[in-house]
């Protein structure tokens, strides 16, 4: 795969999988962009590269199990957590206010984190076992004539 094809593949991902826009952004002719994009997407090397990059991007965006457990452990210990808030004015296309603040987990949040960690490690059984017992009742002698 050459550099221009790689640029096309990267642009294809950034343009939301729009082949024509990606081809033009990668430097291909506007006249042939659509047909060229179709041909490039059928190219095994280009399609494999796109698939690998999408998987890599997916992995980078997702929180790993280790990261999730580390965050749960931090909350369970009651360590202060950094939070970020941004107020955006869409009409004027500008940020009105940005605030970074610290939150200390409440007792309930800490307990939920501990429960979560114990469940993940199998040390906490969330199920209740129901056992069945048969009870035998003797009423005495039964008489039809009474």
From Swiss-Prot:
Disruption phenotype: Virus assembly is blocked at the procapsid stage; DNA is not packaged and tails are only rarely assembled on the propcapsid. Signal peptide: none annotated. Keywords: DNA-binding, Host-virus interaction, Inhibition of host innate immune response by virus, Viral genome packaging, Viral immunoevasion, Viral release from host cell. GO terms for biological process: chromosome organization; symbiont-mediated suppression of host innate immune response. It comes from the Viruses. Belongs to the SPP1-like small terminase family. Homodecamer. Interacts with the terminase large subunit; the active complex is probably composed of a one monomer of the large subunit and two or more decamers of the small subunit. Implicated in the production of cabRNA, an RNA that activates the host CBASS antivirus system. When the gene is mutated the virus becomes resistant to the host CBASS CdnE-Cap15 system. The terminase small subunit specifically recognizes the non-adjacent pacL and pacR packaging subsites and regulates the ATPase activity of the terminase large subunit. The terminase lies at a unique vertex of the procapsid and is composed of two subunits, a small terminase subunit involved in viral DNA recognition (packaging sequence), and a large terminase subunit possessing endonucleolytic and ATPase activities. Both terminase subunits heterooligomerize and are docked on the portal protein to form the packaging machine. This is Terminase small subunit. It comes from Staphylococcus phage 80alpha.
